[in-house]
């Protein structure tokens, strides 16, 4: 029996969960935790709500509440969402807990004492009326990229770009509306650059999935820069050094430790040592938007402290909605609680698992959800189980009949049942959740074919022994389907095992004794009606109708052309921005693009792109930008113009 430490990325407590959160992080992590428990491993599965940072503080001021009141409200919502989805945490705590503050401050102090944290002055926006510095979302203004008003100090909803407060044009304090000034502020930095070689060696020697490994190596190629570790605000974990009143540890300097504080809280309750689990190798489940933090920054902090680094990092890619990027601000999203008001949690766990491999972006479509539930769960899995149980009840008095002499076809069918647990286990060990679940569905499909080929409705009259053997093997498959589905669809699996009067045993092939009582059962899965799907789609359309439209004249003012990147380099002081020299046919232009998290400069040189060439020039980090490179989605995939000639206008 091995000890296993499994974590989920901490959900941020400024809103409830939506399907994107569940798909990328919580459902796959729970599948893996349940699987390892069934294998007999000693699992510690932890999480917490991340309750510090500017978004919560800003929301609290806007609502006339304290940040703790806002965080508490959403902590309870998030906890409820995850419990209703059968996420089986051993510990789910909060970063506002006293224990978390204590652990985070001790961690900070040790790094400071070891010389890995130093002080440096930086320039920040300061509101004279409020008499405070304005980090992140405490400031808004005009986006320098797309010109959208109301862009926040960390993000523009208009174009999706990451921003820094000093980049905003016409910045305003979010609280009082006054224009801030630029002042120097002293902050603490972590010597991330010092761990460049150690991080590279760790990543290259790890078993991380390619999407995590490649992303991290791309950053390492560019060289790591020291990381600011503090913020000027009151809400958060206070810097534990004298003379630093009003300074907190940056959320990415303490939120990681929510894994540790949640485990430590579990230790206090159980009397068991969480360190034994951590030292066995932690497995982090996260969304791909925080790969950098977990694959670069977090292991460097652990190396500096002297702790073991994670054993693996599993990053789920993005989920879009009906072909469009999800947006909570525009309500283009399916909230977990809304989904569960109408549909069963197992349908959610099933669809978000089989929709696509975890390492690939995918889309949630109501039509596809209906199709897969109806075709795969109702018509394949549910149909096989219902036929087997009903036939057993009708012709064998509700008891598993004896198996007679086995034919070659019977033996082949039996072997597929015997091998299933090993096949699914091998896939789950590789974190291939979709393939593992689809193997189970294919096994149920094979069961339907076997049932049809054997024609037990005829055999029960013409050859009772043949019908008895067929139903014995079909019940054997049903029992093992129930066992196999436990990590993926625990509620449905429990119903199958209950119908068959079976115990929740360890992972592995399950023999079935003759005479086992099979209870009368209704179909496990009902088909989803067209009306139900149309109602859900209508909710999105109602919201979409509010989107502001533009005329063809508006569109024709935009000069979008095919270009080719002649040179690319990083911009000093920014982790997101690249300076590009782009050939657009008649001339070369300089563009600052927020592509550094996705692409290295070397990857972009001589690459054809589409670029908006008549954008009003702006300065970003002191570098002039004359246009905008077009890319899609949160993943910032550059639009490929194909065979179009450089300089051609896109119409």
Swiss-Prot record:
- Sites binding Zn(2+) sit at 143, 146, 156, 159
Question: GO cellular component terms?
Answer: aminoacyl-tRNA synthetase multienzyme complex; cytosol
Q: Which residues bind ATP?
A: 328
Motif location ('KMSKS' region)? 325-329
Q: Which CDD domains match?
A: Anticodon_Ia_Met, MetRS_core, tRNA_bind_EcMetRS_like
The EC designation for this entry is: 6.1.1.10
Protein name (record): Methionine--tRNA ligase
Task: Tell me which species this is from.
Answer: Methanothermobacter thermautotrophicus (strain ATCC 29096 / DSM 1053 / JCM 10044 / NBRC 100330 / Delta H)
The root-end lineage is: Archaea, Methanobacteriati, Methanobacteriota, Methanomada group, Methanobacteria
